[in-house]
Amino acid sequence: MSKQAPDYKAKKITQAIRIDGDVQKEVWQQAAWTKRFVDMVSGESGMYDTRAAILWNDTHLYFAFQAEEPFVEAHLTERDSIIFLENDLEVFIDGGDCYYELEVNAANTIYEVFFIWKDAYKKGGKFDIPRFDVHQEQAYTFGGDYDRMGATFWKGTHPRGIRWAFTNFDLSGLETAVQIDGTLNDHSDIDQGWNLEIGIPWSSLELLANGRSLPPTDGDIWKMFLGRFQKLMVGGKEVQPHPAMVLSSHGVYDTHLPEKWSKIQFIH
């Protein structure tokens, strides 16, 4: 994997970052900010300017987002609300036989899911632990975005098949913070947008390491999804599907394709 050309290089820093939503502070000036996100299907420039940056140190992985938004909106405030039905910023981290999904909206509401590919969920294996008991109320089978219809109803269209989705998963030590340049849920003015900061302890990513060292070694590559979904109203009607802006285009409207995610290289 280390021979793959990266889509983004995440620089190592020595200091810790205080997660407060301020992505203009000096430490983020050290980071390489991504290009403007593109449409997930077409690869054309996204409708709003969205960019991200990643930094890391020996203890934490850090993300920052800048999201242009003329009408900053977020009504869902309960943790694990289905915030992708509104507007959100998203990070997915691939762990080979599993992956982690994090979504955050402009109200700093968090939505988390941990996915395990069914073919990797074996009796006595590393996922056969109480935390991932498939008999619990919040464990579901998942075939992928927009796959549950017709011949693909049960298994979806991904060659690997279905996943177990654990919607009660909480990543230990996760920190998120939002700052808004404008007014939330007030359409009487024009906003500039909103910013998001995320901090994740490396110690919480053990299940996603997939044989890699934590923290990473210089040159290691992890696959991650960095994206944004935008609820858009035109003529009083909601545009479906919601416009999706991502770092790396998928060519199809499906977030849950780890093979399409961006290759993030960790460098010293």
Regions found by a protein language model. Give the residues of each.
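Structural preference for beta-rich elements and adjacent junctions enriched in aromatics
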Residues: 1-268
